[in-house]
Amino acid sequence: MLKTAAQEQLLPGDTLQAKWEFAQQAGYDAIELRGKGELHFAARLEELRRARKDGVVMPTVCVDMLHFFGAFDADRRRDALDQMKSQLTVIAEIGGVGAQTPASYGMFSRRLPPFEPPRSEEEDREILLTGLTELGEHARAEGVTLFLEPLNRYEDHMVNRLEQAADLIRTVGLDSVRIGIDSYHMNIEEADPAAVILAHAELIGHAQVSDSNRFQPGAGHLDWPAWLGALHTIGYDGHLALECRLTGDPVEAVRSVPAFLKRSGA
């Protein structure tokens, strides 16, 4: 059975220990952390160390910032790189496996006016390769992995599909950079989500889950047996990290996910 995790902001409780107690009772195997900007994640290091000592399982952190390593502005790119390197260091210090980030989020979409970004595709590619190389080398030095997450076309204009992420990662050529897949974005961008998982099996390092409408798994129409079956086929051994909006009673919505995924083939 595939392991499950819930992002920390979705879990009830005022401490990671309290959130972990709920998570375990609901059937989760881990908590995915959120990494805010301004080195906020590094400032939590003692809190995270105490939680780890108390048995909280925290394998991954997902970036939670307003700008990313593919930003148009050079200063924002530099800051995003520094923030991500710090998050990789912290997740390594608490025994985790890696950190997930998109190239950008909400910066530009080719599906919305003005339709043409201020930077060429060639310039985008050069900036992404430079950033991924720097982050990948830092991740390798820390013994963890950077997960590049493709986002849908309305949230990012650079990396939307797994094949685009795979091309960048193969060009970088570092084992410390892998794809972080997300079921919601794949439902929008991939003609056959299960097939594309099989096609890029060797590069998939992390997985986040929400349904076709961004609500919790079970609230939409995603073909979960096919998607989960593909992960089983490739021997995926990471977590399915819940990253979603919640519909209905939020506590019950979060509680429902592990059992739903199990019924669906996890």
Locate predicted features.
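Metal-dependent catalytic neighborhoods of phosphoester/phosphodiester hydrolases
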Residues: 41-46, 77, 250-253
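Active-site-proximal loop/turn and secondary-structure-junction residues that shape catalytic pockets
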Residues: 10-12, 35-37, 64-67, 103-107, ...
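Active-site acidic/histidine proton-transfer and metal-coordination neighborhood
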Residues: 53-54, 70, 74-178
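Conserved beta-strand positions in the central sheet of alpha/beta enzyme cores
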Residues: 32, 60-62, 100, 147, ...
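N-terminal small/glycine-rich loop or linker at the start of catalytic domains
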Residues: 1-7, 59-70, 105-116
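Histidine-acidic metal/acid-base catalytic patches
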Residues: 1-27, 52, 95-97, 133, ...
